[in-house]
């Protein structure tokens, strides 16, 4: 009996250790997330001074960012051209570490319906890093179309996810991904309707979120989660219809 009891305890300990190991790895896997940027408060004059100190030609809408988490001291500058400049402040001087220009970038978000119905608003860089593996990161280069209605409007955004590489280089990782859309159409036209209706617009839209999983290959698996909603006019918010779908992809393996 003592021998059996000892073996039983060993088995129980082994099972517990195995579960701890699996759960710890699952927790690590769950920690693979996109890295949002935080916008730093900079006046336009300060942004201009930073551009001059970095000796770079900046366009309009200059913004300075840092990563939301971690002790990383790297800073990031974006503008409307668009371009991304990675730099640090060292001994009260700004030093460029790398830069990527997307001024001549040929975006893969080509939708003939958008081009016919909406205005092309050009490209922008979304303020976040998207992990490709333990070392490589991508950014979303977003193409936007929009238009305005009387009392509403519509916007469509498509993203190319681009891997950043040294020496100003980049490589397309994932193309033509629905990133964000929104449409609002006015449905109330009288004072009585505005006063009595719980909702005076037809609204619909879609948003993308991404989950990352290490599958033991060169690049993480990306689960593209799409959340679509439709909220009809004259109905309370509780009647809003939300639908979810997803697509599983691996960067650089797009067909």
Language-model regions, residue ranges each:
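Structural signature of eukaryotic scaffold interfaces centered on beta-propeller domains
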Residues: 61-70, 119-134, 209-217
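Acidic/hydrophobic-patterned starts of short beta strands in beta-sheet-rich repeat architectures
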Residues: 71-77, 132-145, 217-226
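Short N-terminal edge-element motif at the start of the domain
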Residues: 75-135
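Basic/polar, acidic-poor N-terminal "presequence/leader" segments
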Residues: 34-90
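Short consensus segments that form the blades of beta-propeller domains
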Residues: 74-77, 114-116, 148-154, 236-241
């Amino acid at each position: 009996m003592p021998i059996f009891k000892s073996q039983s305890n060993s088995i129980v300990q082994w099972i517990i250790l195995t579960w701890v190991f699996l759960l710890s790895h699952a927790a690590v896997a769950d920690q693979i997330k996109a890295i949002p940027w935080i916008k730093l408060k900079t006046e336009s004059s300060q942004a201009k001074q930073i551009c001059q100190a970095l000796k770079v030609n900046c366009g309009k809408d200059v913004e300075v960012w840092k990563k939301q988490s971690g002790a990383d001291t790297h800073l990031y500058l974006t503008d409307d051209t668009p371009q991304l400049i990675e730099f640090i402040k060292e001994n009260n001087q700004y030093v460029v570490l790398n830069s990527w220009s997307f001024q001549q970038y040929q975006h893969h978000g080509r939708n003939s319906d958008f081009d016919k119905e909406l205005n092309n608003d050009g490209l922008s860089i979304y303020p976040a890093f998207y992990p490709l593996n333990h070392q490589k990161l991508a950014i979303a280069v977003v193409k936007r179309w929009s238009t305005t209605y009387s009392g509403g409007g519509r916007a469509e955004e498509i993203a190319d996810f681009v891997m950043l590489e040294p020496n100003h280089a980049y490589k397309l990782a994932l193309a033509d991904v629905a990133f964000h859309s929104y449409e609002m159409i006015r449905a109330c036209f009288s004072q009585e309707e505005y006063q009595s209706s719980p909702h005076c617009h037809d609204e619909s839209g879609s948003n993308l979120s991404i989950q990352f999983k290490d599958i033991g290959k060169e690049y993480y698996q990306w689960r593209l989660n799409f959340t679509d909603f439709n909220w009809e006019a004259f109905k309370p918010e509780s009647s809003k219809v939300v639908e979810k779908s997803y697509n599983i992809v691996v960067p650089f393996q797009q067909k």
